[in-house]
């Protein structure tokens, strides 16, 4: 006769407590000594209760860069949740749950268990859900005997809630901006900054440090490590966002590289490292998490909502604004990252369009094929995007919509130029123009790109090639910018 659910769980937990006791009785146990016990217990529970493909991964701590100790997968490439463990003698989980470390984890990871291997606290969306003690850890430590098993049914309820968790589909811009911002903040402060500090001290691979040196040597020679951590974290998040707008139904870290356009060489190189090579484990974990968030997001619906909620006609830049306000409002204010009001942009661009007609003999204004434009400090391409809209509007008004494809291919793509120094707005700008052109029925081919280049217009010399990562791509971008 098969065991009931409760009897089976009792069997699993009895074996689990026995394994914990063996570790304790050896007398030399560290926190990591107990990891295999909880991994086996959770996987046994999952197998017995309808979560057959679930897998518990122990996250290595090669550096101080901080993710929780375990990650749980649903067996279908999606993340179920995370687990942070403390030694059994740490009996005050309530005080631990209010520590700075746990606050960061609770803010970043939506389904989290805190445990000392005997007591388990479940947090979802940062809020305490329930806590269950299955045995007394102090009795196990002091008596050297396995303590009595308790609260089996309550523990079953806790684990069932944990394993049943799945991220809801995100359909509104504010929720997505918040979900991405808190993870990007964690990526910047708890992963990239710490990994860079570790790489400076050790003789290891120093991959992130070499990326930093590339940007400092070839683009921004006063770039600090803190600024690079911010630049790199934002670039990763927006790069994943770009890839998601181009992806099919499936989406994960390994697929990001596939969906970055070949013409964006710098971004492509960054994600070759992330998707196809061996990034630091802590970094890979966070990228998996961000990819999981975007997998559960209807990107096109969110971008469309910016049009319908009175946000104006530029959904990409408004998403950028919303993200920055969630990510780091002080940084946004310090850098002056505020978009020029759209009525002002329209007035300036349409005034230029009118002057081209009235004073320079260009009958089609910005749509005239011998007109070239350049924005040397383009930001997120607010002005070039408006110029494109005006040119298409002029062309459609005179010649109909049938030849707009030709206008884009033979005038806008070769004659509209922009240069930007910072990687995040550069990435957002490319996304914006791709979206704008698609709205007019033009999909960029793999060989095409809008002529927005990453370069320093105040130091226009093409940087010398070096062996540093992405040096070739940065040098190529700067050379193309210099030709303009």
Enumerate the predicted regions with their spans.
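Charged, often flexible domain-edge or linker segments that flank or initiate folded functional domains
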Residues: 68-69, 73-289, 335-338, 344-480
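Active-site metal-binding core of divalent-cation-utilizing nuclease and nuclease-like domains
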Residues: 50-77
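Alpha-helix N-cap/helix-initiation sites
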Residues: 27-35, 230, 234, 309-312, ...
């Amino acid at each position: 006769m098969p065991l009931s659910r409760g009897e089976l769980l009792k069997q699993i937990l009895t074996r689990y407590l026995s394994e914990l006791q063996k570790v304790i009785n050896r007398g030399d146990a560290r926190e990591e000594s107990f990891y295999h016990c909880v991994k086996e217990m959770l996987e046994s529970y999952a197998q017995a209760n309808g979560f057959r493909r679930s897998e518990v991964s122990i996250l290595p701590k090669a550096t101080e860069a901080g993710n929780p100790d375990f990650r749980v997968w649903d067996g279908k490439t999606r993340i179920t949740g995370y687990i942070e463990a403390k030694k059994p003698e740490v009996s005050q989980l309530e005080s631990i749950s209010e520590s700075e470390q746990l606050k960061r984890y609770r803010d970043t990871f939506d389904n989290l268990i805190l445990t000392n291997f005997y007591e388990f606290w479940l947090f979802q969306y940062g809020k305490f859900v329930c806590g269950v003690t299955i045995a007394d850890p102090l009795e196990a430590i002091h008596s050297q005997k396995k303590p009595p098993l308790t609260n089996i049914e309550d523990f079953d309820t806790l684990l069932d809630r944990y394993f049943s968790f799945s991220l809801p589909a995100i359909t509104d811009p504010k929720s997505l901006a918040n979900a991405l911002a808190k993870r990007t903040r964690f990526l910047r402060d708890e992963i990239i900054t710490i990994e860079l500090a570790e790489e400076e001290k050790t003789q290891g691979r120093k991959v992130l440090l070499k990326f930093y040196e590339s940007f400092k040597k070839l683009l921004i020679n006063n770039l600090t490590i803190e600024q690079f951590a911010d630049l790199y974290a934002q670039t990763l998040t927006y790069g994943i966002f770009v890839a998601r707008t181009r992806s099919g139904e499936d989406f994960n870290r390994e697929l990001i590289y596939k969906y970055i356009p070949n013409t964006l060489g710098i971004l492509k190189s960054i994600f070759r490292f992330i998707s196809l090579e061996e990034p630091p484990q802590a970094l890979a974990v966070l990228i998996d998490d961000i990819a999981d968030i975007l997998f559960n997001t209807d990107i096109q619906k969110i971008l469309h909502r910016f049009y319908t909620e009175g946000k104006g006609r530029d959904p990409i830049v408004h998403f950028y604004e919303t993200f920055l306000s969630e990510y780091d409002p002080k940084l946004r204010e310090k850098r002056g990252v505020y978009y020029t009001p759209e009525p002002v942009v329209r007035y300036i661009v349409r005034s230029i369009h009118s002057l081209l007609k009235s004073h320079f003999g260009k009958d089609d204004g910005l749509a005239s094929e011998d007109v070239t434009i350049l924005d040397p400090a383009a930001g997120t391409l607010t002005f070039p995007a408006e110029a494109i809209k005006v040119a298409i509007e002029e062309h459609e008004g005179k010649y109909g919509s049938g030849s707009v494809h030709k206008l884009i291919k033979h005038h806008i793509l070769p004659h509209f130029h922009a240069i930007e120094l910072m990687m995040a707005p550069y990435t957002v700008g490319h996304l914006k123009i791709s979206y704008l052109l698609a709205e007019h029925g033009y999909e960029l081919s793999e060989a095409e790109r809008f002529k927005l280049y990453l370069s320093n217009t105040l130091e226009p010399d093409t940087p010398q090639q070096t062996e540093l990562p992405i040096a070739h791509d940065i040098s190529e971008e700067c050379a193309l910018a210099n030709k303009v």
